[in-house]
Structures are given as structure tokens and as C-alpha cells.
Amino acid sequence: MKYLFLINPAAGKGKYQPEIADAVRKYFDGKNEDFEIVFTSCAGDAEQRARGIAETGERVRIFAAGGEGTVYEAANGIRGFDNAELGVIPCGTANDFLKYFGDAEPFRNIEAQVNGKAFYIDLIDAGGRLCLNGCSVGMDAMVARDMNLFKRLPAVSGSMAYKLAVLRNFFTPRLGVELSVSVDGGELKKGRWLFAVIANAPYYGGGYKGAPTAVPNDGILDFTCVEAIPHLRVPKFLSRYKRGEFSELSYCSQLRCSRMRFVSERAVPVNRDGEISEETEMSFSLCRDALRFVVPAGAALPDAFKENANIKKF
């Protein structure tokens, strides 16, 4: 098997990438293993590199070292290639998908990653692009959009960028977006929503537990929709929402589905694993067992994940 490490030098403002590259070289030193380190050079490079190696037909384990954008690109690059597996080495913004597996330390350990097992997981097809973690539309997508702008500033950390983005979007005359939403082919339901989330895993947005029951290999997606509420109620709601303790709130709807679609009269920001675009409509659907995801040795496997992994373990 070949091991390809795609390292985004810009992720996390470049703090950890040299350490990761050194750790990779140190681990493989003296071993008769085929490995390669590539520093990505621009947007889309990780996707092209991943697809290029997958197209050779060689069995390959690709590690995306960066933020959610790097992982998103690599996952789309190996779409449809059974010979390719994807692992994640966190060194950028969020990496919320990994929170499902508990402590992130095994994901930073090169030996643990190389010796890990690859399990089939589901993905979300979001307007023709694949997402590991989740998608959203509404206020939180607006926050993600503005966070990407703030975090480019030299003295602004990821957490500070998030706080600034929240403040910018909170102080608006009216919260939420007008959307018509359909689930599993049902009728479109029109309303004003604070946000809507379609999730493959529990956490997104820097640690918000917006889909508490989501399991990334259970063959179903989790949908959360929150009606627009007055400004004064938002801080208390977000506190509960971050902990995943909002199921009893009358203005929150949760269900499980395989498809979701929204339509808007005006273009609204859509978040796809941290990548933002402006759309007037989009469909989201389950892609069952669409990716072999590397869980490093020593990482926690939740019981629900293990139950499903027994069916499709690589």
C-alpha cells in the first residue's frame, strides 16, 4: 500500500505542518514502505492530487492534513475509487467530524494512523459535492462565511474569528432566512428559519452538537431545523444547542431522513463542510458506504459505530 500525505501549509496559519512532515519522515525512516509528502499549493490541489493517485488503481491510504476544506477536497477527489482510503490529521480549523471519535490525539499520531483500520462511512451528496460531516443553511452558514474572512487577519485566532462572525450576524434587524424545506420528497414547508442542518455526524461549527444522534455509518442522515426566534432568546438557545440539549424546544424540529431540499427566493449562504457558496436551492442526499475512513489505532469507537462497522469493515 502507498501512503500519501496531503499537507495544507495554510491551514491553522501553518503552525503544525512542519512537525507533521517531520513526524512522517521519522516514522518511515528505515522502513520498506512507499510514502509521499505533498504540500498543497492552492485551492483544489488536494482534490486533484487525491484523484490523480486514486486513478492509478494502486491501493492507497491518503491522509489529509489540514482543516475541513482539505478533507472536503480529498474526499471528493477519491469519489468512486474503491482502492483509496482517507485519513485525517487535524491541523486546521474545526475538524468537527473527528469529535465523534473522542480524543483527537490518536489522529495526530502517525504510527497510529498508519496502523489504523479503514471503515466504510456514509457521505452527504450536497448539490453534487460530497461532505463527510454536515451541511447547513441560514445564520450558521453566514457565521461560517464571515469566520473565513476574519481568520485571515494576522492577529485573529480561530476562536476569535468565530466570535467576531457571530457578533456581526447577531446585530441585524431580523434574524434568519426565508426558506421552503422538503424532507424525503415531501411537500415544501415554507417558513423563516434561524438555520437548517443536515448532518452525518454530531458536531459542526466548532463544537456545536447540532445532531446529537447522528452516526456516520448508520445509513441515515439527521436533520435539524430551527425557527427564527427573537434576538434576546438566541444566547440562551445557542448555549443549549452547543450541548445538544434542545430536543424539547418547541421551535426546534429534529428528524432522520435520507433526502432534504431547500428553495429560497434569494441566494443564501450554504455551508458544505466549511466550504461556503451562495445558492437559491440545493438538494442533499445520503450516499451509503461511500468512503473508507481511517480510524487510527487507539481512537475510541462509539458503540453505535461499532454495531454498524461489523457489517462493512474493510
Predicted segments with their positions:
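ATP/nucleoside-binding phosphotransfer catalytic cores, i.e., glycine-rich phosphate-binding loops
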Residues: 183-185, 190, 215, 225-314
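ATP/NTP phosphate-donor binding region
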Residues: 1-62, 300, 306-314
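Gly/Ser/Thr-rich active-site loops/lids in small-molecule metabolic enzymes
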Residues: 151-161, 212-232
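Catalytic core of DAGKc-family lipid kinases
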Residues: 6, 31, 40, 80-194
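Glycine-rich phosphate/pyrophosphate-binding beta-alpha loops
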Residues: 136, 140, 197-211, 276
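Short Gly/Thr/Asp-enriched flexible loops that form oxyanion-binding sites at enzyme active sites
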Residues: 70-83
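Active-site-proximal cofactor/substrate-binding loop regions of enzyme domains
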Residues: 63-65, 72
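Glycine-rich beta-strand-to-loop/alpha-helix junction loops that act as flexible
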Residues: 9, 65-67, 91
